[in-house]
C-alpha cells in the first residue's frame, strides 16, 4: 500500500506515461478519484483522455507510472483484471447485445443459475426481478418490463441499462465515455440523472465528454488534459464558469483575457 494513501481514494494514477511509437500520448499524468465523486475529464481531441481511461480500464498498457486501487498497487493485463478490481467502463455504444432482453444484458456473462447448478440452467425469474429493481434505482420511471429486448430501447435507456449493470456488480468506479453523445435533450437529461443516482448509491464516476455544459450539470470536480499533460485539477464547477474551463482546455491564459 502506498504510504500516502488516503482512505477516501478509490483510484490513484501516478505519473502515467504512454507512447504510441514516437508519439507521446500521456506525459506523467497523475489523477485521483475519491469515494462518491463524479469527475469530469475534459480536453480537446488528442488531449489524452481516451488513452488515460483505456489504461485505467485495462484495455491498453502504459510505459511508466503506477496505478493504485484502494491503496493497493495493480497492474492490469486486460479489461477483466480491471473489472475484477471494481472498474467498469461504459462506452458510447453501450456494448449491449440488442437481441437480448434487458435482464439478460444486465447479467451477461454473470448469469445466476438455478439450483442444482449442475444443470447450468439460468435463473431467468431472479434476473427479471433484480433487473426491475435496478431500472427503478437508476431512475427509469417508465414501466419497462425486464424481458424487453434492448433493441426496443432509446439511446438514453440503453445507457441506463449499462449503468445499472455496473451498479449491480458493485463497481466502485464507473467510467462513462461520451455517454450523452448523439442523444436528444430529454434523453441527455435522463442519462445525467442516471449518473447522479449512481453516485447517490455509493459509486464514483469518471465522466468524459466534449459537451462542457453536460459536465457542469453533474460533476463534483473537473480535470483537464491538454496535449498529454494534466493542466488543471480540483476545478469546482460551482466556483468556476464554463468560459474559464474552455480557456484552460485551449491554453488561453485567463490573465491574458483580462488584459484584452
Model regions and ranges:
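Glycine-rich phosphate-binding loops of nucleotide-dependent enzymes
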Residues: 2-260
